[in-house]
Amino acid sequence: MKTYRCRAYIMTLLTLSLVIPGVSAAQSNQDSGRRMSQIDSATSGVHDFDFLVGHWRVHHRKLKERLANSHEWIEFEGTLSSQPLMGGYSNVDDLVLEVPGVPYRGVALRSFDSKTQQWSIWWLDSRRPLGPVDPPMRGTFKDGVGTFYGNDTYNGRPIRARFLWTKITPTSCHWEQAYSPDEGKTWETNWVQDITRVH
């Protein structure tokens, strides 16, 4: 009888030794899956601007006068170089704008917030090298289109500003800026960039 109980006890231990690691492995896989899901969720938008990394030629079109019913456009060329920072959570563009008679340089800095899943964008250029830095534009990408909004002033009046990134391919993309003087009811596009990759 004692021998039978001993054998039964040993068999139980053997069975548990086989089952428990399987349960532990399954639990570990579930935990790992949850962690990966959380990481994916937190970083799902962090690669939105990867398409822009590299060196580009830019054809610019800018309205000569903004919010003045102007239909006269100024066209000029330029360059753009973009690189990622902070492991992809930020990136910076260095732009050369070959405006006839008044060329200048500009810097666009972007930073990704994993909590809100939004990008913030700041602009500074050599016409005002000591600032102030423009108020940030904030937004996201959806269905291949990046849409960003911000509050600003133009000629002393409050406006809403909007950036759009569209027509994104490995070798080209399109950007435009628009202002609204009436809280977004109407928009005037005042700056357009057609961007073509150099390398």
Where are these regions (language model features)?
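Bacterial N-terminal signal peptides
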Residues: 9-21
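N-terminal secretory signal peptides that target proteins for export/translocation
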Residues: 1-6
